Design a protein with these regions (language model features):
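Extracellular glycan-recognition/adhesion modules and their associated mucin-like linkers
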Residues: 1-25, 43-71, 90-118, 140-143
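Short, tandemly repeated low-complexity microdomains enriched for cysteine and small residues
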Residues: 21-42, 67-89, 115-137
Length: 143
């Protein structure tokens, strides 16, 4: 039996929390929750750059994580270049742990996907950011 066609994305500093969508908001919540499919993602080639990645919802096909005013939510792909750029991220070595993963925004290259108060957003981060900020921006891709 092969690997599933979807991924779950776990928080580094809240390892029982998964990235999910709830009422179109992107957040991390402790597993288990219902519906479980809210935490299942298809990692697609980036909509704005094939070197990146876009997160497509399994239970809402055609809907992707995208940032708007630095807040990340689930939205239907409208086919625009702006949507594509907002929904594309580039994998990097984890800011808190190089064995994990961080996701840099395509159109704000100094901003990374991170959680703050359990809600996903993009913020400017670097190796000199606080340990908490770097941990908030570090994730594990699994099943």
């Amino acid at each position: 039996m092969g690997a599933p066609a979807w991924n779950r994305i776990k928080s580094y500093n809240f390892p029982d929390h998964l990235i999910r969508h709830a009422d179109n908001a992107a957040r991390i919540d402790p597993y288990p929750f219902d519906p479980y499919a809210d935490a299942q993602w298809r990692l697609r080639p980036g909509l704005a750059s094939s070197s990146g990645v876009s997160f497509e919802s399994v239970n809402y096909p055609g809907h992707y994580l995208r940032h708007s005013n630095y807040v990340v939510g689930l939205a239907a792909n409208d086919g625009s270049s702006g949507f594509a750029a907002d929904a594309t991220f580039h994998r990097t070595a984890g800011l808190a742990d190089g064995g994990w993963t961080s996701f840099r925004s395509h159109n704000f290259p100094d901003h990374y996907l991170r959680h703050a108060n359990y809600v996903l957003r993009i913020d400017p981060l670097s190796a000199s950011s606080s340990a908490v900020d770097r941990a908030d921006a570090t994730f594990h891709i699994g099943y």
